[in-house]
From Swiss-Prot:
It is found in: Cytoplasm. Signal peptide: none annotated. FAD binds at residues 11-16, 123, 178, 367. Keywords: Cytoplasm, FAD, Flavoprotein, NAD, tRNA processing. The gene is mnmG. This is tRNA uridine 5-carboxymethylaminomethyl modification enzyme MnmG. Belongs to the MnmG family.
Length: 625
């Protein structure tokens, strides 16, 4: 008997987990298929979550009702807030994960989730009828039927591991690759590219001389990604910093001909922002040294990840490199680094919902879409799961805009501009980064999560209480006038401010660069009555109000352009005067509105003006008819 589901998710990595959970939490009967149940939520590369932009994505996933933030909060070995000396727009959390505990926690959550079944099996083929996906077929011939399918295959599609002059078929960390499904996608007509990524060697902690390295401790205050976390892990493990040197670089130079990167064995394009050590040596040969972070992979293992030493050089050369690095001269290598090539689809073949344009109800998320990183994968996964379930159940799909979330920036970049290399999310990619902060992800997206059925009533009530507290406190400070008495003047001067000449509203005093919310309380001789997160919002919203308002005005302009819809079936060959490149790009991407069209590479303002005139003429013609 064929088993039937609403949604099937292929893969149980970081994208697959969020897709499966989101689909199930929206009420869809969901099946998650994975090659190996023991490798759910596996971290084949770095043992960390978060970082600039990426850490904000994790917070956004949490605000939408996803799981990554909660899992890392329970299983990390270290957590740090980055860029604390800079403005709030670029601050972000980064956590070192206990890889095994993280897997165990995610597996527990998935197994306990209502509406979600998990099955070990390798999908070989999509079942397509009348250009619409209807299910999947495994390598042993088992069929599972569904109204929607989400593909989250990571680097498994025709995966090949490369080490020196060796190349063999494999998924990450020597798991089984997915070859037949990769062939199936090509046969269906998808445009496929070949990408490459890599991983560094792991060394034995017992054989590291830490006295030659610099300690990198975590923060000594409680940190969390999830807005719901109330218990913090303060017993943290440090990381350590060391560097390459001239001797390391000589080993690389002497053996560069053995690197798969430079021997021609690797054809795939690698990630620009995470280059291999041999790539760093070639591209930045003026640098006398490169940073290497020694990151423990967990509390109950001696494996240490050598961040920054990603390589495809032969194993014996990797050992030679390690022998030149301070602290690692006698380190035992437990696993060799390697490069991996894999198939990815060209992401301009997707709608902003992550549904494929070619086959209805088929969604893709994660590295199959050309991205790098666990967080980018999870962000796509939750949206693909939300939209697959919403379409099947008739409860609606959701597209996050570039002003809503970094997830919106990520997906819009992929489906509008495409990518010719593994895509990494950066703060510089977001034009509204002052709006898309680490601290306000819940204020931006909890309403969305609640409307989608992903947020519980209890959580939503707590969120609304927080939001009201912020509004009330800003209003209270707006109503209080501070007099320039001796107490006030002394507090202001002690905090580096200039004396008041006249009375001033508390809210206006808080706007001064040197003033903090704590300073205002000290002047008012009040104790802390509100949660720290509320106080933080009051201060940030007040200090950056002018800049925030300017960003919001820009957002309104873009929203007006987004309201100018473009018919999905518009024949661009009939739009006179469009530049040839613009016509080709518009036909390929099929933008949903003028705002998206304006972001397509090769479409210039003149093309947009022509398109606007054409659409207006079409409206007038329909009115006359």
């Amino acid at each position: 008997m064929v088993q039937e589901y609403d949604v099937i998710v292929i893969g149980a990595g970081h994208a697959g987990i969020e897709a499966g959970l989101a689909s199930a939490r929206r009420g869809a009967k969901t099946l998650m298929l994975t090659i190996n149940l023991d490798n759910i939520a596996f971290m084949p590369c770095n043992p960390s979550v978060g970082g600039p932009a990426k850490g904000i994505v994790v917070r956004e996933i949490d605000a939408l009702g996803g799981q990554m933030a909660k899992a890392i909060d329970k299983t990390h070995i270290q957590m740090r807030m980055l860029n604390t000396g800079k403005g709030p727009a670029v601050r972000a959390l980064r956590a070192q994960a206990d890889k095994v505990l993280y897997q165990q926690e995610m597996k527990r959550v998935i197994e306990d989730e209502d509406n979600l079944d998990i099955m070990q099996g390798m999908v070989d083929e999509l079942i397509i009828e009348d250009n619409e996906v209807k299910g999947v077929r495994t390598n042993i011939g088992t069929e599972y039927r569904a109204q929607a399918v989400v593909i989250t295959t990571g680097t498994f599609l025709r995966g090949e591991i490369i080490l020196g002059n060796m190349k063999y078929s494999s998924g990450p960390n020597h798991q089984l690759p997915s070859i037949t499904l990769a062939d199936n996608l090509r046969e269906l007509g998808f445009e496929v590219v070949r990408f490459k990524t890599g991983t560094p060697p792991r060394v034995n902690a017992k054989t590291i001389d830490y006295s030659k390295t610099e300690i990198q401790p975590g923060d000594d205050v409680g940190r969390a990604f999830s807005f719901e976390t109330t218990e913090y892990i303060l017993d943290q493990l440090p990381c350590w910093l060391t560097y390459t040197n001239d001797r390391t670089h000589k080993v690389i130079d002497d053996n560069l001909h053995l690197s798969a990167m430079y021997s021609g064995m690797i054809k795939g394009t690698g990630p620009r922002y995470c280059p291999s050590i041999e790539d760093k040596f070639v591209r930045f040969n003026d640098k006398p040294r490169h940073q290497l972070f020694l990151e423990p992979e967990g509390r109950n293992t001696n494996e240490v990840y050598v961040q920054g030493l990603s390589t495809s050089l032969p194993e014996h050369v990797q050992r030679q490199m390690l022998e030149t690095i301070p602290g690692l001269e006698k380190a035992d290598m437990m696993r060799a680094g390697y490069a991996i090539e894999y198939d990815a689809i060209v992401p301009t073949q997707l709608w902003p919902t992550l549904e494929t344009k070619m086959i209805k109800n088929l969604y893709t998320a994660g590295q199959i879409n050309g991205t790098s990183g666990y967080e980018e994968a999870a962000g796509q996964g939750i949206m693909a799961g939300i939209n697959a379930a919403g379409k099947v159940l008739g409860t609606g799909e959701k597209i996050l805009s570039r002003s809503d979330a970094y997830i919106g920036v990520l997906i819009d970049d992929l489906v509008t501009k495409g990518t010719n290399e593994p895509y990494r999310l950066l703060t510089s990619r977001a034009e509204y980064r002052l709006l898309l902060r680490h601290d306000n992800a819940d204020l931006r997206l909890t309403d969305v999560g609640y409307e989608l059925g992903m947020i519980s009533e209890e959580r939503y009530a707590r969120f609304n209480e927080k939001r009201q507290q912020i509004q009330d406190e800003i209003q209270r400070l707006t109503d209080i006038r501070i007099k320039p008495n001796e107490h006030t003047q002394s507090v202001i001067e002690a905090n580096g401010g200039s004396r008041l000449k006249d009375g001033i509203l508390a809210i206006d005093l808080l706007r001064r660069p040197e003033m903090t919310y704590n300073t205002i309380l000290e002047i008012l001789e009040e104790s802390h009555q509100l949660p720290e997160a509320v106080e933080e919002q009051v201060e940030i919203q007040t200090k950056y109000e002018g800049y925030i308002n300017k960003s919001l005005q820009q957002v309104e302009k873009v929203k007006r352009m987004e309201e100018k819809k473009i018919p999905e079936d518009l024949d661009y060959s009939k739009v006179d005067s469009l530049a040839t490149e613009a016509r080709e790009k518009l036909a390929e991407v099929k933008p949903l509105n003028i705002a998206q069209a304006s972001r397509i590479s090769g479409v210039n303002p003149a093309d947009i003006s022509i398109l606007l005139v054409y659409l207006e003429q079409g409206k007038l013609q329909r009115v006359k008819n």
